[in-house]
């Protein structure tokens, strides 16, 4: 029986070192996830974790004509014939959780999550059937400064992990008046060439007109480029809001560009929408996106509550970091003690516990290999520091620690070595 994984999934594994699969190394994931936790904490957002599967109706609310609902979800019946769906995106699940905990609901609810999502994606580079998303939802406040604040948080995350050439592409879908006028103009524009559009866009013409602008089909691109711009139909109130957000982005030094063709792949978005892209020459590709969804909470059975959020695919973030040449170390600042005999075994066991209590990640090599082989293992596994302990070290109480990355050593009595290791770890 084959033990191979199904298509579209992968292991995040600690010992991956090959350049092709380095993005799957768990140390890289820990670094990126740590940056997300740290930045969200700085902005006052709290972590939320929702179940891997929920009632299918939870995700139907993201839009009847969204690709996710129509063809990309993993849905199954349980033993009692109830329809359940593996979580395809985070926003609907967070809204459901907020309403389930309505007694604890605040006027301003600020959540973030780092969770696996499941979609039946076509097999292509950077797209997986289980993928991991860093997402954020701010529910309860509608204000240009809230939108700018969330975009600032996202920008800080990209900077913290080391991404380069980032830019925020923004558009404004507007309120009911703006959308009604724009839909009328779009319908008239596409009507005369409807039979030349892709089958999917012809379907969207009757079901969800705005989504034609999101088409990636080659036969649609000529018409999308010539389509009316929503910015020509935006009313004064919407324009004032949009301008206020852009002014704050400019003040924060966030690189942005207005893209009047930008719409999002889920039906619940209103007003401001955006994509975070990395720009390479004349090409760009998205590393995250989101926007405002002021009607979803009410559509889900709750009170009318404005909301703004985003989702970031961590696979693409890590792959892009490596493609941009970031020197991401796959190792942690870890000490390996190598006892050379049984007497040293007992000392290393005791000392390792003491070092861990000092905050130094410490492991012991119990293999009793020859020193040369033990050092090679440590180098191959990217251990930061190594200390060999034998009869002489125990007798003199003088220890030599080798820095494996700098190929240098430092030595001293036990307490001196401990102080140096604490310094090295804290200043890594």
UniProtKB/Swiss-Prot annotation:
GO terms for biological process: histidyl-tRNA aminoacylation. GO terms for molecular function: ATP binding; histidine-tRNA ligase activity. It holds the Pfam family HGTP_anticodon. It is found in: Cytoplasm. One of its GO terms (cellular component) is cytoplasm. Keywords: Aminoacyl-tRNA synthetase, ATP-binding, Cytoplasm, Ligase, Nucleotide-binding, Protein biosynthesis. InterPro entries: aa-tRNA-synth_II, aa-tRNA-synth_II/BPL/LPL, Anticodon-bd, Anticodon-bd_dom_sf, His-tRNA-ligase, HisRS-like_core, HisRS/HisZ. Its EC number is 6.1.1.21. It catalyses: tRNA(His) + L-histidine + ATP = L-histidyl-tRNA(His) + AMP + diphosphate + H(+). HAMAP family: His_tRNA_synth (MF_00127). Homodimer. PANTHER family: HISTIDINE--TRNA LIGASE, MITOCHONDRIAL-RELATED, HISTIDYL-TRNA SYNTHETASE. Belongs to the class-II aminoacyl-tRNA synthetase family. This is Histidine--tRNA ligase. The lineage of its organism: Bacteria, Pseudomonadati, Chlamydiota, Chlamydiia, Chlamydiales. The gene is hisS.
């Amino acid at each position: 029986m084959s033990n191979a994984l199904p298509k579209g999934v992968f292991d995040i594994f600690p010992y991956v070192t090959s350049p092709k699969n380095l993005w799957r190394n768990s140390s890289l994931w820990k670094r990126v996830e740590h940056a997300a936790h740290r930045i969200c904490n700085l902005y006052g957002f709290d972590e939320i974790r929702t179940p891997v599967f929920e009632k299918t109706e939870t995700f139907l609310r993201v839009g009847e004509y969204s690709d996710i609902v129509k063809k990309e979800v993993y849905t199954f019946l349980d033993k009692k014939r109830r329809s359940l769906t593996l979580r395809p995106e985070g926003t609907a699940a967070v809204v459901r959780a907020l309403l389930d905990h309505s007694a604890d609901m605040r006027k301003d609810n600020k959540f973030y999550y780092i969770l696996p999502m499941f979609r039946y994606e076509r097999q292509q580079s950077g797209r997986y059937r289980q993928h991991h998303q860093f997402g954020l939802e701010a529910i309860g406040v509608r204000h240009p400064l809230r939108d700018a604040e969330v975009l600032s948080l996202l920008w800080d995350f990209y900077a913290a992990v080391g991404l380069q050439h980032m830019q925020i592409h923004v558009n404004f879908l507007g309120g009911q008046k703006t959308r009604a006028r724009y839909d009328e103009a779009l319908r008239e524009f596409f009507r005369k060439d409807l039979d030349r559009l892709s089958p999917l866009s012809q379907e969207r013409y009757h079901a969800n007109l705005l989504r034609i602008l999101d088409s990636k089909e080659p036969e649609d691109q000529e018409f999308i480029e010539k389509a009316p711009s929503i910015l020509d139909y935006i009313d004064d109130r919407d324009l004032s809001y949009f301008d206020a957000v852009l002014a704050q982005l400019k003040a924060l030094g966030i690189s942005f560009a207005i893209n009047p063709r930008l719409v999002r792949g889920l039906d619940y978005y209103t007003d401001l929408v955006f994509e975070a892209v990395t720009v390479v020459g004349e090409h760009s590709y998205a590393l995250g996106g989101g926007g405002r969804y002021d009607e979803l909470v009410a559509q889900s059975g709750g009170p009318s509550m404005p909301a703004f959020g985003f989702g970031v695919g961590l696979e693409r973030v890590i792959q892009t970091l490596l493609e941009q040449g970031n020197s991401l170390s796959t190792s942690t600042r870890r000490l390996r003690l190598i006892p050379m005999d049984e007497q040293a075994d007992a000392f290393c066991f005791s000392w390792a516990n003491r070092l861990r209590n000092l905050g130094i990640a410490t492991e012991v090599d119990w293999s009793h290999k020859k020193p040369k082989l033990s050092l090679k293992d440590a180098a191959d596994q990217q251990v930061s520091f190594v200390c060999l302990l034998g009869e002489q070290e125990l007798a003199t109480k003088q220890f030599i620690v080798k820095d494996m990355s700098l190929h240098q050593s430092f030595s001293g009595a036990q307490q001196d070595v401990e102080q140096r290791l604490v310094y090295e770890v804290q200043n890594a």
